[in-house]
Amino acid sequence: MALWAKARVWMAGPWLSLHRARPLGTRASAAPKAVLPFEAMPRCPGNKWMRVLQIWKEQGSENMHLDMHQTFQELGPIFRYDVGGRHMVFVMLPEDVERLQQAESLHPQRMLLEPWLAYRQARGHKCGVFLLNGPQWRLDRLRLNPDVLSLPALQKYTPLVDGVARDFSQTLKARVLQNARGSLTLDIAPSVFRYTIEASTLVLYGERLGLLTQQPNPDSLNFIHALEAMFKSTVQLMFVPRRLSRWTSSSMWREHFEAWDYIFQYANRAIQRIYQELALGHPWHYSGIVAELLMRADMTLDTIKANTIDLTAGSVDTTAFPLLMTLFELARNPEVQQALRQESLVAEARISENPQRATTELPLLRAALKETLRLYPVGITLERQVSSDLVLQNYHIPAGTLVKVLLYSLGRNPAVFARPESYHPQRWLDRQGSGSRFPHLAFGFGMRQCLGRRVAEVEMLLLLHHVLKNFLVETLAQEDIKMVYRFILMPSTLPLFTFRAIQ
């Protein structure tokens, strides 16, 4: 992407629109202007097929978030971007998110990932809601929401997550206390990944895997590697037309299919076990989302499998990386860490009595997670394929156009978030703060918001709650971490963390 990021700017002069952004729900009183045609919109310089070649040559686009951010600085708050056979519009101001929300149809459309679709078509698998548009998407989504996204569902699976989070903290504490100094310096990332798999598997399938022990299940470790391979190959294939990449990237397609094969096998084994237990009439108790869906019996088994696999694949990296970046920010902002610790200690008795209270008793910790996702959004864009003509930044956007909101730039806009480079969770709680005027968009909006958002939120909330009340978290690293785009935004490297037990 550096090829076009360094290209000559098409529009001369500094761009000041970033510093005049308005929060959602406000309107400027400027006189109306004549709407400009779509063709007049600034276009990202460079050849669309050269971009495909660049992605193929670099085996991805790791700096996409930075390149797009720079393009906004050069071209203004809206621009056209073409890559290969795809045409899209990028925006980054709150007012444009609001317009997209207002234009939301009954069946919000978004671009479907060609590599993921290609695998399912080749293997004869049904698609889950992540890979559907139209009436079938809406029907399936409305049937999934009660057992995955609703507040009653959250109340059912929160105690399961709490048990895993407590085990994580106790296991870590045992390791720390083996050291005479009462502290331990380590790479915590593998443990956090195991936690997210352990918690998500329990919530989905009602099954503990034993990943928090010293000798974790090899199948689950292979599952982590399969996810990494799937995400990496997705980026390398998603922008290149399949008719071209089948010749230029045949080994990458093979790696992509093999990764999905393992993910499907992993999930299918768990679903089959639950199905057999229910068929045998085992005594019922809440044992996860899949069992609830099977007992509800308003979706076919194949549909349940398709959506469970989407949730399984999307429940690990997308939760682990925000947890790791939150630990990093708290380690280099000890005053914020202490405020969060005090909140957790005050609320501990009530949360211990009823883990569901964590979602209401820890407002500052919830704000810290919002702040992490503002700076490091796992998904760098939100997108909609608009169903009707609309106007964004005074340009006509024809129906059918794919519009992408770059969350990375939106979260770092000083007109929306004061001192955007600083880690300041309190901004989300201040009555006059930017966070109180602007919604938290990391999980999307409307009917197409992330189906697993409540699972992810409670997994992050409870792990941090139990870690903070038991440990001081420190790091020698104070410099910003380089983030890379590999289908999701992730740190290129992570520093070592020191955990000091609190007696």
UniProtKB/Swiss-Prot annotation:
Transit peptide, residue positions per record: 1-24
GO molecular function: corticosterone 18-monooxygenase activity; heme binding; iron ion binding; steroid 11-beta-monooxygenase activity
UniProt pathway annotation: Steroid biosynthesis; glucocorticoid biosynthesis; Steroid hormone biosynthesis
Membrane topology: Peripheral membrane protein
Required cofactor names: heme
Catalysed reactions, semicolon-separated: a steroid + 2 reduced [adrenodoxin] + O2 + 2 H(+) = an 11beta-hydroxysteroid + 2 oxidized [adrenodoxin] + H2O; 11-deoxycortisol + 2 reduced [adrenodoxin] + O2 + 2 H(+) = cortisol + 2 oxidized [adrenodoxin] + H2O; 21-hydroxyprogesterone + 2 reduced [adrenodoxin] + O2 + 2 H(+) = corticosterone + 2 oxidized [adrenodoxin] + H2O; corticosterone + 2 reduced [adrenodoxin] + O2 + 2 H(+) = 18-hydroxycorticosterone + 2 oxidized [adrenodoxin] + H2O
InterPro entries, sorted: CYP11_CYP27_families, Cyt_P450, Cyt_P450_CS, Cyt_P450_E_grp-I, Cyt_P450_sf
Homology family: Belongs to the cytochrome P450 family.
Function, as annotated: A cytochrome P450 monooxygenase that catalyzes the biosynthesis of aldosterone and other adrenal corticoids. Differing from other species (such as human, rat and mice), it is able to catalyze three sequential oxidative reactions of 11-deoxycorticosterone (21-hydroxyprogesterone), namely 11-beta hydroxylation, followed by two successive oxidations at C18 yielding 18-hydroxy and then 18-oxo intermediates, and ending with the formation of aldosterone. Steroid 11beta, 18- and 19-hydroxylase.
Protein name (database record): Cytochrome P450 11B1, mitochondrial
Origin species: Ovis aries
